[in-house]
């Protein structure tokens, strides 16, 4: 069965500009401004983006930001820690929602 995700499709990202150039341009300007150096340096922002990409399980962003981090000099150890933080937060959310099971058990008793 073919995968929904095909890394070569990432190159088609800009095609959205053909259907709504104004909105695409606004998004790209906002994105560029968000990712440039500010209170956080660009390397840190790429690391955050990588962690978020893993947390939301978005394969195109995982692919893109894995490469961007490597090109920015992010070490494998830094990437591993960032992804581990994302996993901990995601896992913590699952555990936090366990309270719903507790509430259901309380209602049943």
Where are the predicted features?
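Acidic, glycine/proline-rich low-complexity segments that act as flexible tails and inter-domain linkers
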Residues: 1-44, 97-109
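Residues in soluble alpha-helical coiled-coils and helical-bundle/repeat scaffolds
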Residues: 18, 39, 56-57, 74
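Amphipathic alpha-helical segments within well-ordered protein domains
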Residues: 32, 49, 66-70
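Alpha-helical scaffold segments that form or flank carboxylate-/histidine-based iron centers
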Residues: 45-53, 82-86
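Short, thiol/selenol-centered motifs that function as redox-active sites or metal-ligating centers
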Residues: 48, 52-64
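Iron-sulfur (Fe-S) cluster-binding segments and ferredoxin-like electron-carrier domains
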Residues: 64-78, 102
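Short Fe-S-cluster ligation motifs
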Residues: 84-100
């Amino acid at each position: 069965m073919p995968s929904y995700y095909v890394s070569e499709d990432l190159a088609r990202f800009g095609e959205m500009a053909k259907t709504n150039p104004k909105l695409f341009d606004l998004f790209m300007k906002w994105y560029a401004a968000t990712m440039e150096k500010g209170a956080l340096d660009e390397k840190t922002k790429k690391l955050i983006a990588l962690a978020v990409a893993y947390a939301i399980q978005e394969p195109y962003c995982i692919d893109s930001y894995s490469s961007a981090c490597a090109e920015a000099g992010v070490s494998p150890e830094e990437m591993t820690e960032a992804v581990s933080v994302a996993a901990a937060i995601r896992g913590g959310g699952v555990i936090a929602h366990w309270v719903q099971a507790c509430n259901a058990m309380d209602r049943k008793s």
